[in-house]
Amino acid sequence: MFAASLCRTCHQISGEGGIAGPDLTQLGNRFSTKDMLEAIISPSKTISDQYGSTVFFLKSGGSVLGRLIRQDNLKYYISQNPFDTQTIKAILKKDVVRTRVSDVSPMLPGMINGLNPDELKDLIAFLKSGGNPAHPAYASSK
């Protein structure tokens, strides 16, 4: 379910998966099932500074949204696509009038909407267990 619901595209568990979002290997040790479900259902409720996006307001009147990867004296380098973190866009600092941290998570809401109750239980068991199939969380997901 972790791969089928696209979680793996952005998140790692036990060293496998994407890097656009936080590593979820220890999630079950830090958060309750309720907290996990809230974070999945409403990802913008709490956004880690590490993984949030920035809005760059341009002199032209437009704006650009992306995760700030790095910057130098002349440019901001941002990733705009959480499914393709290797594609980086450069924005000239001289073209930016201001920036602000976005209050919208790059994680899309409703990622679990297509799961049936058993699939959702399996996903939560996987998250609670850190991907360990022998973890007791699987017994309670049945």
Where are these regions (language model features)?
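Short, solvent-exposed loop/turn and secondary-structure capping segments
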Residues: 12, 20-23, 135-140
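Extended surface/linker regions that mediate inter-domain or inter-protein docking
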Residues: 1, 52, 63-64, 69, ...
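Active-site phosphate-binding and catalytic loops of NTP-dependent enzymes
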Residues: 47-50
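Long, low-complexity intrinsically disordered regions
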Residues: 108-142
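Gly/Gly-Pro-rich "capping" loops immediately C-terminal to redox-active cysteine motifs
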Residues: 17-41, 53-101
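Positions in alpha-helical segments
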Residues: 22, 105, 109-110
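Sequence/structural segment immediately N-terminal to covalent heme-attachment motifs in c-type
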Residues: 1-13
